[in-house]
């Protein structure tokens, strides 16, 4: 229907052109001036709406980070948000102000120039400098988070993903995980653990819920039995892909207990959650622990 209407309008314009009829509607100075005056009130209304959205949805944001490295992640996020916010505000103010000040009027023509080296340098170098600061800061934070640790100083565990559940495995009394190999997968050995490896004999396997120690480094290994999953623990600001046929790892130090977070959020039913952050199938949404 819309395409047909557009075609009819085009036919009308072509026929009018052939007849020598001017189809352009005359716009008076008073019309353009009126529209220009509306720009500033619209700008204020737009900013007011943005402030309203921030205020309305602030309670849906994540609470403070419950991990040591998460504080750095939040600081980096806020740093980016401040830069983006300044650019967002400045660009919109200039956009609406120029539409208000330089509206079309009779006898006034805009200056056209094809090239300006100075302008090209400004809008290339300035964003590049800001981007360089963000990248360098981000890399510094990432290198700090992923720096090597001594496994002997951490609680070692593994998260195994499959459609559509998680299984956790702890290193047991020796804090060492037994080896695993996908070729060993069987009904009686769903995690494909190498039972000939003595380190696996005291491994603790849990489903439904797992626990992390507070103020102690946790070294997590991740793997998948089927498709790519992504272990996402939003309150700890931690995420790592689970890839079939290989192990990935991530370490962090929890700093806030469940009881403390319940008090901070004033939510007696609060619990930390592990979710899959990759669309892995029909009931991906239910893959939580």
Locate each region found by the language model:
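Hydrophobic alpha-helical segments
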Residues: 1-83
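Transmembrane alpha-helical segments in integral membrane proteins
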Residues: 2-10, 87-104
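Alpha-helical transmembrane segments of integral membrane proteins
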Residues: 43, 84, 88-91, 127
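Non-transmembrane, membrane-proximal soluble domains of secreted or membrane proteins
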Residues: 52-79, 92-289
